[in-house]
Amino acid sequence: MKLTELMADTNKKMPHLYLDMDGVQADFFGAWAAKHNVGNYKEIPDTETAINELATSSPEEVYNFFRELKPLQGGGKVVQWLNQHNIPYSVLSAPLRGPYAKASVEAKKDWLDEHNPNATPNAIFTQHKHKYALNGSEPNVLVDDYGKYLNLWSNAGGIAIKHEDSNTEHTIKELEKIYAPYLNR
């Protein structure tokens, strides 16, 4: 379904919004760069090896890495906008792959308890985000920074919004377009 079609029919049910964590609300990439003593994660020589090292380090190291992520200002603005406009949302975040995935999920829940406490009870942790793209035949919305998840979401019939913390205004403008018909009901 196209965004214009969704907006044309104001009798439709409001699409549910799913909000990513890492790279949207929590500064995974800044922490990952710091862990490797580089200014930007793109300077990590072999990112696949680096993520595998974290994934197989120890449950404590994985937990501490995710629990200590700094909140991103742009993600905070998105959450604030959603709350101001009474847009229900669920956090939808992928756990770290590997043997300590559970430790990453526990850390993410604890992070949410501190930084976005109302989101914890409905948070979903899965590598298969695209399974939430539709509610029956109606599209849901995903705000994410990772192209792979956005493409899978769109291909499954959902509405994908690419978030960049440096351009939060774009994310909010896209949300305004989608949710405008539902804001003054």
State what each model feature region is.
Residues M1-H16, V24, H36, P71, ...:
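Charge-dense, intrinsically disordered terminal/linker segments
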Residues L6-E60, N155:
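Active-site neighborhood of HAD-like aspartate-dependent phosphohydrolases
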Residues A26-F29, A34, Y89-V91, G98-K102, ...:
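Short catalytic/ligand-binding loop motif for oxyanion handling, primarily in non-cytosolic enzymes
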Residues I44-E53, S57, I161-Y182:
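A short, conserved beta-to-alpha structural element at the edge of catalytic cores
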Residues E68-K70, G75-E106, L112:
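Substrate-recognition element of Asp-dependent hydrolases with the DxDx(T/V) motif
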Residues S93-N140, L150:
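Substrate-recognition "cap/lid" segment bordering the active-site pocket of phosphatases
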Residues N140-E176:
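Acidic, Mg2+-coordinating phosphoryl-transfer loop and its flanking beta/alpha structural elements
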